Amino acid sequence: MTTRTESPTVVQLPPVYFPTALKVHPQIELMEERGLEWMARYGFCSDPVQATRVRDSRSAHFFGYLCPKADPDRLQAAVDWGYLMFAFDDVSSDGDSSALLDIAVRIVRTLEAPDANVLPSDNPYTAPIVDLATRVHRTCAPEHVRRLVDSHTKWLLGAAWECAVRQRPSINDYLSARVMYAGAEPTFTWFQLSEAVVVPEQEITSPRVRALTEMAGTVAAIDNDLYSHGKELWTRQSRSDLSGTGLDLPSCVALRDRIVARFFELRNEVLPTASPALARYLHNLTCALRGNFEWGLETERYSNPDGNHPGAVRTLGSVSNTPSAVGPPGIPSIDWWWR
């Protein structure tokens, strides 16, 4: 339950390392208008607080920063999914793991077979999920559909783990699971669906590309922990972010800086022999690093934590041109990225 504090919560983040600038899709406003209309059509803007929470998620900006060159018509499904899944996250984080697992299995099956009729008819998420699944099957290659199903399976399994765990995890355990329940895998799969050409299987599943995908997802997850830290302080929630494992903010930043530095090092090794489809995927992964961070600082999802208190949280961030640390961090679940 949200508890209001007496004054705004202000968090000053240490500078974070980014060697590239933010890139912005030129048709964000169009995608936002379409996405909000889609959410309203399915009843997710029926009261002022709910409408504010939907709008404040800024899903069009999120994907517009991550995929700045995508066809806006193909990217619209990702934008709509973002609005819906941010709303889903708001309610699923408060439920029990058994209920989450049940709905997760039904969502995954619906993505596989839109006419499966396994989602409850009275669930507000059923109709929009079926709509998204139908659109994907109609417009995307079979390889894209399978990757979307697999990535949702991984994400929802991680979300169920987050809901079920009752003890403070080690850093190693936390990083292994965080990249799953942060939703990075389905987000990056939507990158692929926004392109007509499929990244060949032998490329997308190669160890080096898998490492790049995991690195981008882990940086996004850690940065989410950073820019949502003030929200958790304001709501007086237990520490479910990386700082809950015992790391202070400078140590969290040092860890993500190591990963960002390694990402660019490995990306530059992979790009010269990448197919055009893989090169575009790696471009979007690169944009995701800076785009996710800037979106997190901007979105009212974290500055207005419950939709009723605009400006309740202020998170101040800045960017550095040099990493605060480099090299493998000595964490078994991720050290393989440096090998």
Swiss-Prot record:
Residues reported in the UniProt entry to bind Mg(2+) 3: 224, 228, 232
Keyword Cell membrane: no
Top-level EC class as recorded in UniProt: lyase
Cofactor(s) essential for the protein: Mg(2+)
Reaction equation(s) it catalyzes: (2E,6E,10E)-geranylgeranyl diphosphate = phomopsene + diphosphate; (2E,6E,10E)-geranylgeranyl diphosphate = allokutznerene + diphosphate
Keyword Disulfide bond: no
SUPFAM superfamilies: Terpenoid synthases
Residues annotated as binding Mg(2+) 1: 89, 94
Record keywords, A-Z: Lyase, Magnesium, Metal-binding
Record's cofactor remark: Binds 3 Mg(2+) ions per subunit. Mg(2+) can be substituted with Mn(2+), with a loss of approximately half of the activity.
Pathway, per record: Secondary metabolite biosynthesis; terpenoid biosynthesis
GO molecular function: metal ion binding; terpene synthase activity
Residues annotated as binding Mg(2+) 2: 94
Pfam families: Terpene_syn_C_2 (PF19086)
Coiled-coil regions listed: none
Protein EC: 4.2.3.222, 4.2.3.224
Function: Diterpene synthase that catalyzes the conversion of geranylgeranyl diphosphate (GGPP) to phomopsene, a diterpene previously reported from the fungus P.amygdali. Phomopsene is the main product, but the enzyme can also produce allokutznerene (about 50% of phomopsene production activity) and traces of spiroviolene. Cannot use geranyl diphosphate (GPP), farnesyl diphosphate (FPP) and geranylfarnesyl diphosphate (GFPP).
Family: Belongs to the terpene synthase family.
Protein name (record): Phomopsene synthase
Organism encoding this protein: Allokutzneria albata
